[in-house]
Curated annotation (Swiss-Prot):
It is a single-pass membrane protein. The chain crosses the membrane at residues 25-45. One of its GO terms (molecular function) is DNA-binding transcription factor activity. It comes from Sinorhizobium fredii (strain NBRC 101917 / NGR234). It comes from the Bacteria. InterPro entries: AraC_XylS_family_regulators, Homeodomain-like_sf, HTH_AraC, HTH_AraC-typ_CS. This is Uncharacterized HTH-type transcriptional regulator y4fK. Its main location: membrane. It is found in: Membrane. PROSITE patterns: HTH_ARAC_FAMILY_1, HTH_ARAC_FAMILY_2. Residues 318-417 form the HTH araC/xylS-type domain. Keywords: DNA-binding, Membrane, Plasmid, Transcription, Transcription regulation, Transmembrane, Transmembrane helix. Residues 335-356, 384-407 bind DNA. It holds the Pfam family HTH_18.
Length: 427
């Protein structure tokens, strides 16, 4: 009987399942996702690993950060739903492996091939061709990568309709040569209309609708907002405090035609450049295009770029911003800002939303992120945690998420690049 009891106890013990620690569970999920992505890359040769990670919008926090601290700050949990959806979206938009390999340039003459190829080169848009399209139709498309940005040009006889699947944090500039483009923003319910010889900027937000008229010809310049932000701050030495907007503008005029000519020349030169010269040439053209964009186009940041002001802002708002710049390393509340501006908190919030497109605290956050970026680039940052705490970010993990959202890479990566550049210069 004693033997049976011991065996029974052993059986019960063997059937008990030990719970998996939370940190190990998070690590297992991340490892499983990485393995799945690598398998997809190996099994599908045209798949670009960098494009996959960009599509997943991963935030890779420094490996030196303890996993417990990452889990405690919970930035990863907030990302899991979007990671899952983005993975499904990316896989769903892949063409079949039975189909011939597609390049970034194509010419299609049937409705089905037009949709298939557009879905391959522009996967964030759900494309449709007008039902009135005749059997004899055509679409010629070419895309040219310019580092983190890219150029896309097209000429087509069909009417195209598209629905954006998700937010991409891209700013797109559409130059319409012939035809017409309309983009409707789902959030603001406003429609941007771009007629021939005009250019305007638009954001790829989930639910946005785009209609491109038949017999249209256009050039698009797509760039991450983080790259636009870095360029603006590097050129002006001031923080990028609100979203960039370029209204519909005629680009055939002499003073604003330079950007279009630069992009066309970049398209030609990069298409014929040798592989060794491509990175340096792309970097030069990207910098030149952004300088011309900021200095010659009538965007909403033009006055701030040229004169160091952000328009005729109220005196109270300017006082609040001056107080922000003087107290980047000190705790600041909305009441402190209102007292410095000598107005009520509600009035101050209303002024910031009108003239800065955001709340006072979001503008203060942008100032602090810009200060962190400047400290990292100048080599003044000892550690990311110390830098975050010094600038009043109580959660280093959250600081990493905000920094990457603003500048396109994690602060630890930016710090590592700065140190590597410094060591190369010393050598």
């Amino acid at each position: 009987m004693q033997i049976d009891a011991r065996h029974g106890s052993a059986d019960k013990t063997s059937h008990q399942v030990m719970p998996l620690p939370f940190g190990k569970l998070v690590l297992c999920l991340l490892v499983a996702g990485t393995i799945a992505a690598l398998i997809a890359v190996l099994l599908y040769p045209p798949l670009n690993p960098l494009a996959l990670f960009s599509m997943l919008d991963w935030n890779l926090i420094a490996a030196a950060e303890p996993l417990v601290r990452q889990c405690g700050s919970l930035p990863l949990l907030d990302k899991f739903p979007s990671l899952g959806w983005n993975t499904v979206l990316f896989c769903a938009t892949l063409p079949s492996t039975d189909e011939p390999l597609r390049t970034d340039s194509f010419v299609a003459h049937t409705r089905d091939t037009i949709l298939a190829n557009l879905g391959s080169v522009e996967p964030n848009w759900r494309w449709k061709v007008s039902s009135e399209t005749p059997e004899a139709c055509s679409l010629a498309y070419h895309r040219q990568r310019v580092l983190s940005a890219w150029l896309a040009s097209a000429e087509h006889s069909v009417c195209l309709q598209a629905l954006a699947r998700r937010d991409t944090r891209l700013i797109s500039f559409y130059f319409v040569l012939s035809g017409h483009i309309e983009i409707t923003d789902r959030r603001t319910r406003k429609t941007l209309s771009i007629s021939p010889n005009h250019v305007a900027s638009a954001r790829e937000r989930a639910g946005n609708r785009m209609t491109i008229q038949s017999e249209s010809s256009w050039l698009a310049f797509h760039i991450p907002e983080s790259a636009l932000r870095r360029s603006f701050e590097d050129l002006t030495g001031r923080p990028y405090v609100h979203e960039f907007v370029l209204p519909a503008t005629c680009f055939s005029q002499d003073d604003v035609q330079g950007l279009y000519q630069t992009l066309r020349q970049a398209e030609r030169d990069l298409n014929s450049a040798a592989s060794k010269a491509m990175p340096l040439l792309a970097k030069a053209y990207k910098q030149l295009a952004l300088v011309k964009l900021f200095s010659t186009m009538p965007h909403n940041l033009a006055e701030a770029f040229c004169q160091g002001t952000s328009g005729a802002a109220p005196r109270q708002l300017l006082k609040a911003e001056a107080f922000m710049r003087e107290n980047l390393t000190n705790p600041v509340t909305i009441e402190d800002l209102a007292a410095a501006a000598r107005c009520t908190p509600r009035a101050l919030q209303r002024m910031f939303r009108t003239y800065r497109g955001g709340s006072p605290m979001s503008v203060l956050c942008n100032y602090r992120l810009a200060a962190a970026h400047g400290a990292i680039k100048a080599g003044r940052a000892g550690s990311i945690t110390e830098l975050a705490l010094n600038l009043q970010f109580s959660n280093p993990g959250r600081f990493s998420v905000l920094y990457k959202s603003a500048y396109g890479l994690s602060p630890s990566s930016a710090l590592r690049f700065t140190r590597n550049e410094g060591s190369v210069e010393q050598a």
